[in-house]
């Protein structure tokens, strides 16, 4: 007879043996895969800036991460990320919110004309839905439109051909273009355009709204794929805190709200759908035992060690060659940090960054006291 319902639970159910006493930066059994992801599966990656680390690690370990919008041959490799190439499976940049994801999918899979929301900048046209993919903007509106048409055909190809979508949930806060209803990856006025409250509104997506967006994404993509085999979804939550908040809350409170909502949405989806799995990169990096090592000095940028710690748990479940490689190898071959350097100035001004993250621009434009 048990004295307590906790008496015979496995060690992973208790904080002390499974977290506080964790050794060698490994937390055993924190992730048990729901389904196989093989190296022959076609993977589409998308999400907030942390998702770029995941895509880079998957490629390096031999997974088939599709890229249907590659850089032109004449563009030097060191310029690829300046133009949005090589970040994801197509040139859509960071998709920070669930609403951004479903709106892009609907646009790419529809037969209608592309949505054109643009800003003027020094005589050029900036695609407000992808403000960072052309550093100097487009010379004409027709050029912007043609690039967007081409881009959407690439996204459509990704959505129809993928076997697994790896999507990192990043933010709940976003800015909406009122006339079209489209949400933007970056607030107006940060890199181009200007903020006019009659044209744009701040939106903070709640639990129900995020959940509905993800369910709608499934319906839209499933309908377009027809008789193709059903795709699977691997969700993660970005451990990168918000750079700034447009809510009335303190940034720390706003960040906790945002990540809590997204984590809850991911859990609800994973618990209710056999085609959806959740990988706990958020928990692996934000856990208090390794917190000091997992972040750089700005308490926001994920360190090389932090990325490697998270991805080693993923690889141990999905890479059959991982044991022969060894766990220490994952640390040594981790993706570069979001921003190189060890102080705030270096982190803000690094030109060698391996990760493109538009949200960081919000801090650069603030009015200093």
Question: What residue spans do the PLM features occupy?
Answer:
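Extracellular glycan-modifying ectodomains
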Residues: 1-369
